[in-house]
């Protein structure tokens, strides 16, 4: 057993001396026993000279003093994996935080693992249905792909990710892993209670390192969740869903400790290793010939600036992007997805079919034309438009409102019953609106409804009111 002692503590960064010169390897976990008998895990980050290592603490360092004994485990942080973690809530080091006792797992995985070899990867492109109209029509998600939900503060990223968990976990009987990275503890608790109520919890593992945790935990918790998902993919040959809320906090945690580790800051004060750290995480979230990991990641956009290095670095790894816009949220359209900014790699007639592709392009064209005309409308008013443009604007406004949808997870806020809309119903409805079959209906009828039948029903109610 190789032992060292603490020589310096600066916030979450702890220096440890190993006098025998047998230094732990980079990424090895070290354990400090506190006076109250609890254990604190440190992760080795740097070798400073022949006897000293610099580490990051996975929990708060209150109560640590110089001279305390540190034990080298000679392994990276290990997390329990397998069926026994389903229905449980863990922290970054794989310890349960749900008060339900120990996790009796037969196997553990290191949180740092190599990404699968190139020849093991699967390249099959296939869409999966989410039941959310704007996503299924305009930026379809691919099975085994990576999707990002981009948005500033308070535009609905977490609500959208919770709705996706609700729809996908209920519709598809696969396993899900949820990583709560540096977000609100209240939201994590709401998710836990909601999953227990809906019965989805038995097929879900939750791993949390929330806002109140030190940066060490927030920088590693996504890797812990990923290792659990990799086990189901590689050893049980399953299709797994991985939800991460919020991947920006992973980057933020790295930047918090970067200067303390002696690295020169890069653009906007981020760590110089930003692209490397993001790549190491994202390259593991892939589909192999054994099974797939389909990931949905919420990405906070600082000050609504998509060119900020953190969201910009994440963009390059994604197959589909759903951009949430404050200007659309201000119109009261939820989900506040920007249909013109959002993209998908599989929006291709050879993958999703010609009918779906043509409808999606027609919707984008009509919305783009409406956007171009908005300046003219603002200055001169609607009366100055040609009859053709007036009709186009009327249809575009209906399309815009029909892209909104009542969510199951927001029922208590909206008072409206949540709707899951099948892809064929979505395509049919938008096709009919663009062809002008519903020109006689008021645009209010299209707001916060599910299918086109719901809109027709709402129009009748509005007429009778």
Swiss-Prot record:
| Enzymatic reactions | ATP + H2O + 4 H(+)(in) = ADP + phosphate + 5 H(+)(out)
The family database entries (Pfam families) matched by this protein are listed as: ATP-synt_ab, ATP-synt_ab_N, ATP-synt_VA_C
Q: According to its record, how does it sit in the membrane? A: Peripheral membrane protein
Query: GO terms for molecular function, please?
Result: ATP binding; ATP hydrolysis activity; proton-transporting ATP synthase activity, rotational mechanism
Q: Which InterPro entries match?
A: AAA+_ATPase, ATP-synt_VA_C, ATP_synth_F1_bsu, ATPase_a/bsu_AS, ATPase_alpha/beta_chains, ATPase_F1/V1/A1_a/bsu_N, ATPase_F1/V1/A1_a/bsu_N_sf, ATPase_F1/V1/A1_a/bsu_nucl-bd
What domain of life is recorded for the organism? Bacteria
Binding of ATP occurs at 151-158
Q: Which UniProt keywords apply?
A: ATP synthesis, ATP-binding, Cell inner membrane, Cell membrane, CF(1), Hydrogen ion transport, Ion transport, Membrane, Nucleotide-binding, Translocase, Transport
Q: Which GO terms describe its cellular component?
A: plasma membrane; proton-transporting ATP synthase complex
Coiled coil stretches, renumbered:
none
Its subcellular locations are: Cell inner membrane
User: Has the keyword Transport been applied to this entry?
Assistant: yes
Give the enzyme's EC designation. Answer: 7.1.2.2
In terms of PROSITE patterns, this protein maps to: ATPASE_ALPHA_BETA
Gene3D superfamilies attached to this UniProt entry: 2.40.10.170, Bovine Mitochondrial F1-atpase, Atp Synthase Beta Chain, Chain D, domain 3, P-loop containing nucleotide triphosphate hydrolases
Q: What interactions and quaternary structure are annotated? A: F-type ATPases have 2 components, CF(1) - the catalytic core - and CF(0) - the membrane proton channel. CF(1) has five subunits: alpha(3), beta(3), gamma(1), delta(1), epsilon(1). CF(0) has four main subunits: a(1), b(1), b'(1) and c(9-12).
Q: Which family does it belong to?
A: Belongs to the ATPase alpha/beta chains family.
NCBIfam families xref list: atpD
Its annotated function is as follows:
Produces ATP from ADP in the presence of a proton gradient across the membrane. The catalytic sites are hosted primarily by the beta subunits.
Name under which the protein is recorded: ATP synthase subunit beta
Taxonomy-wise, where does this protein's organism fall, top ranks first? Answer: Bacteria, Pseudomonadati, Chlorobiota, Chlorobiia, Chlorobiales
